[in-house]
Structure formats: structure tokens, C-alpha cells
């Protein structure tokens, strides 16, 4: 599995702000989108381009445009929605597919409770977005769904990742590409990434309980 921890100074600075315990919902949302934009830049560096001729202000100009497969962005509900605009800011024509996953309390297995994929998903590059890669169970399930739908080129962008989750995904799906702003220390006894970001979904949607 191709794993890239993007150590750009801007990402490191913004990630430090995201980790603050006293961060506001507004600032968390904005920073999450900004880091996502920077990850998107890296995750799309290998997209093919072709030459095309356009009419410029001083005559015809040879420029380039992206060619090849089109992209579908796949946010995992609910926290993945907080990264969506960060990708769309750079790829505004991308189609959006949505996956909702939850753990079945009886079997402890991850199940899909919502799936809305674009009709031609099999012919697109699928870019999964989710702020946290913790245990890896949800991400493995999401990739399972996309592969069952015919996807061949699957890329994942997460803000922070735990080594345990990376290992699980790599075992199940060694052919995907993973981009993250940070590979953190690991999981605590409650399954949270340390140092992590806390509950990214709660922080994005403003549902953090105050003492």
C-alpha cells in the first residue's frame, strides 16, 4: 500500500492548530478544509494531462487540461462531510458519492446503513475522505463497498491516522493509496487516536459537550 504522510510546513502548522483543546467549531471546520485542500494537491499529482489549444488575449496558446478518468469524492458519514468542500474547492466538477457506516452492536461488524454512489462509479477515481483512520474497520468496509461496485483506483485522504488502522487497511487492501497529514502514536484504551484530534465529527458539527 502506498502511504504518504505529507509533512509540508503549512500542513504541520494547521494540524497543530487543529489539535488545540479549545478550538472553536468554526476554526476546526475551516482548518479541516484547508488541510484537506493541501492533501488533495498531493493526492492528485499523478493525474494525466493533455495539451490543448485555446484562444488567449494575445493569440492562441497551448495549455494543458486534466485527462483520463474523472473523480468521485466519497465522504464517509458523518465526519467526512467536513472535508468535502476542501476537495471541491480544487475539483469543483467532481461528482460526490456518499457512504454511511456503523458498527452492528450485535455482531460488532461494520455495516453499511447508507450508500449513494454515482452511476458510473466504476469508471472513476474514488477518493475516500474521513478525518480519522483509527482502527481501520470503517475504511476497510468502505473500500469493500467501492470494490464491489467495480472501482479500481481508490485513494484515501485522512487528517490523522493510527498505525493500527494503517496496518489493518494495508492487510485488507494493499493496492490503495493513502494520504495523511500525520501518522500519530497510536490508539488509547478507548480506541481514540493519540494525540489525535478528539472526536472530529463532534467538532465539525458543533456537538461537543461542554463541562
UniProtKB/Swiss-Prot annotation:
Uracil binds at residues 193, 198-200. Allosterically activated by GTP. It is an enzyme of class 2 (transferase). Binds 1 Mg(2+) ion per subunit. The magnesium is bound as Mg-PRPP. 5-phospho-alpha-D-ribose 1-diphosphate binds at residues 78, 103, 130-138, 199. One of its GO terms (molecular function) is uracil phosphoribosyltransferase activity. It catalyses: UMP + diphosphate = 5-phospho-alpha-D-ribose 1-diphosphate + uracil. Its EC number is 2.4.2.9. It holds the Pfam family UPRTase. Pathway: Pyrimidine metabolism; UMP biosynthesis via salvage pathway; UMP from uracil: step 1/1. Its cofactor is Mg(2+). One of its GO terms (biological process) is uracil salvage. Keywords: Allosteric enzyme, Glycosyltransferase, GTP-binding, Magnesium, Nucleotide-binding, Transferase. InterPro entries: PRibTrfase_dom, PRTase-like, Upp_B, UPRTase/APRTase, Ura_phspho_trans. Belongs to the UPRTase family. HAMAP family: Upp_B. NCBIfam families: PRK00129.1, upp. Catalyzes the conversion of uracil and 5-phospho-alpha-D-ribose 1-diphosphate (PRPP) to UMP and diphosphate. This is Uracil phosphoribosyltransferase. The gene is upp.
Amino acid at each position: 500500500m502506498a502511504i504518504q504522510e505529507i509533512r509540508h510546513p503549512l500542513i504541520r502548522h494547521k494540524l497543530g492548530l487543529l489539535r488545540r483543546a479549545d478550538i472553536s467549531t468554526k476554526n476546526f471546520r475551516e482548518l479541516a478544509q484547508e488541510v484537506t485542500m493541501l492533501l488533495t494537491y498531493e493526492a492528485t499529482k499523478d493525474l494525466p494531462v493533455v495539451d490543448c489549444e485555446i484562444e488567449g488575449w494575445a493569440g492562441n496558446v497551448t495549455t494543458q487540461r486534466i485527462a483520463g478518468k474523472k473523480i468521485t469524492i466519497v465522504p464517509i458519514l458523518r465526519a467526512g462531510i467536513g472535508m468535502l468542500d476542501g476537495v471541491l474547492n480544487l475539483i469543483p466538477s467532481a461528482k460526490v458519492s456518499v457512504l454511511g457506516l456503523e458498527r452492528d452492536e450485535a455482531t460488532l461488524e461494520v455495516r453499511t446503513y447508507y450508500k449513494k454512489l454515482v452511476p458510473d462509479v466504476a469508471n472513476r477515481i474514488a477518493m475516500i475522505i474521513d478525518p480519522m483512520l483509527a482502527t481501520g474497520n470503517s475504511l476497510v468496509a468502505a473500500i469493500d463497498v467501492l470494490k464491489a461496485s467495480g472501482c479500481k483506483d481508490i485513494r484515501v485522504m485522512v487528517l490523522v491516522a493510527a498505525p493500527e488502522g494503517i496496518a489493518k487497511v494495508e492487510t485488507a487492501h494493499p493496492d490503495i493509496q493513502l494520504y495523511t497529514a500525520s501518522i500519530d502514536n497510536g490508539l488509547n484504551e478507548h480506541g481514540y487516536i493519540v494525540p489525535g484530534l478528539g472526536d472530529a465529527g463532534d467538532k465539525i458539527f458543533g456537538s461537543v459537550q461542554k463541562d
